[in-house]
Amino acid sequence: METSLRLRGGGSRPQSKSQEGLRIHAKEKLPIASNALLQAHGEIHAATGAPTYLALLFRNFYPRLSANLGLGLAIHFRNNQPLPLAWDNFSYTLRASKAIIPFPSNALLGINLKGRLLADKYFNPTARTAAVELAWTILDLKRGQDVRLKLGYQLLHKMPYFQLRENNWTFNAYMDGKWDVRFDL
């Protein structure tokens, strides 16, 4: 099981305010075929102990295309919402990504295309995201230290973002003032 501590801040919208603060996130990947797995996520707010997120996602990988596709269910708990009401507000998730390596001589520099669609229980779309990222991985920057830099652009929100990952630490910053930090335990 993969476990991480996540801290988010800087949001100005009410729904982002409810997701700020320290959260404990757990993820389990269960292989079900050679190129497929079932991925379960769960998250609780560290201060209240209340669940903030639960998800179950079927992911299929296409190695020859450097792509993957995921389909699943997610529940976001907001403002200590009682459990039966939260289950009434679950959403469907469809996500896809494709990696492009423009310089075959340097496989550590690449372009990622990502898309995600969320739909309510009646299959009405509620949120869409699409992004393009330039990703650069630097192995052994210092002994035992791997670094990954990502510069991305959210196409639908017309907003750039940045990610810096160093071994167990990840820092994300968005041009609208939001940020988050993750530490993988």
Curated annotation (Swiss-Prot):
The keyword Transferase does not apply. It is found in: Plastid, Etioplast membrane; Plastid, Chloroplast outer membrane. The keyword Transmembrane applies. Residues 40-63, 99-105, 139-145, 171-176 are chloroplast intermembrane. It is a multi-pass membrane protein. GO terms for molecular function: porin activity; voltage-gated monoatomic anion channel activity. Keywords: Chloroplast, Ion transport, Membrane, Plastid, Plastid outer membrane, Porin, Transmembrane, Transmembrane beta strand, Transport. Residues 1-22 are annotated as: Disordered. InterPro entries: OEP21 (IPR034575). One of its GO terms (cellular component) is pore complex. Residues 1-29, 74-88, 116-128, 156-160 are cytoplasmic. GO terms for biological process: regulation of monoatomic anion transport. The chain crosses the membrane at residues 30-39, 64-73, 89-98, 106-115, 129-138, 146-155, 161-170, 177-185. PANTHER family: OUTER ENVELOPE PORE PROTEIN 21B, CHLOROPLASTIC. Belongs to the plastid outer envelope porin OEP21 (TC 1.B.29) family. Voltage-dependent rectifying anion channel that facilitates the translocation between chloroplast and cytoplasm of phosphorylated carbohydrates such as triosephosphate, 3-phosphoglycerate and inorganic phosphate (Pi) depending of ATP to triosephosphate ratio in the plastidial intermembrane space; in high triosephosphate/ATP conditions (e.g. photosynthesis), export of triosphosphate from chloroplast (outward rectifying channels), but in high ATP/triosephosphate conditions (e.g. dark phase), import of phosphosolutes (inward rectifying channels). This is Outer envelope pore protein 21, chloroplastic. It comes from Oryza sativa subsp. japonica (Rice).
